[in-house]
Amino acid sequence: MVHNDLIIGEGYHRKAGEPHAEVMAIRSVENHDLLKQSILYCSLEPCAHYGKTPPCCELISSHGIPHVVIGTGDPHSKVDGKGVAHLRSHGIIVEFAPSPKVYRQLNEVFWTNMTKNRPHFTLKWAENNTGHIDKNRTAAEKPLSISGSLAALRTHQLRASVDGILISSKTASLDSPSLTTRKWSGQSPTPIILLSQDFPLQKEWLSSLKVKPVLIGKVLPEGYPGITCDPRDLNQWVPKLLDLGLNHILVEGGARILQSFIDSDLADSIHKYISKDQLEEGVNAPEAPEFTTIAQLGNDRYERS
């Protein structure tokens, strides 16, 4: 909320079911009399329907806010221009920002959910300088430690920002990962495990998970929620994850799953860490498109697409 070029209020949408950003921005203004001479700037078109919260466009018009600047329209079928139409019908000036791509990136998870009817997938892996993500090993051997402490911290920060974390039962069997955000504040994501008869899950590991997992396979263990289908066919289960409230998913492995997401054009973003270590032979890292962001995290090279 801006009054005479001064910010008098601001807000953001914390999570589904809680008040939207417009509501929080209006609530944060101490003197509501100023709203009638203020401009509301929002990244997404104000909603126009009753869902988990009331319509934001009605709240805006009820406060007499005369001017609204919007980053981008809302692709949701229940909005899609209806919010703008309501505002203009109440005499409110509505403008759109000149660079909608910036605001779509800001709301990239929502845009993927709405326009592609599936979760937003972020892929993550670490590889050494020779392009391997692990050594060839048995279940009795520990996984190869590749990235350093800063990369690990960044990974846990990523985990805290997503709804689910996806791995294969092979990765679960070989590594027994905790899949938590123990190195970063925030709630741990829901583990999503793709089952394979060749790598049955250990009951001890399943019971050790902090969050009850979602299992995907032809036959599911009793007592665990999941999707019964062929996990190798992504089309059978990817859209169903939205129904479970899993809007943003971090895919951590293994290599075959990561490559399948890339090949299926499901890799919405990729985070890759490259160490200076070398390995003559091992498990090859996925082949990915060009990366646009390059930085240094301690001794590791960080690339992101």
For the regions a protein language model found, what residue spans apply to each?
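Short beta-strand scaffold segments in enzyme catalytic cores
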Residues: 1-5, 125-126, 132, 303
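Short, charged, surface-exposed secondary-structure boundary motifs
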Residues: 79-80, 105-106, 201-204, 223-227, ...
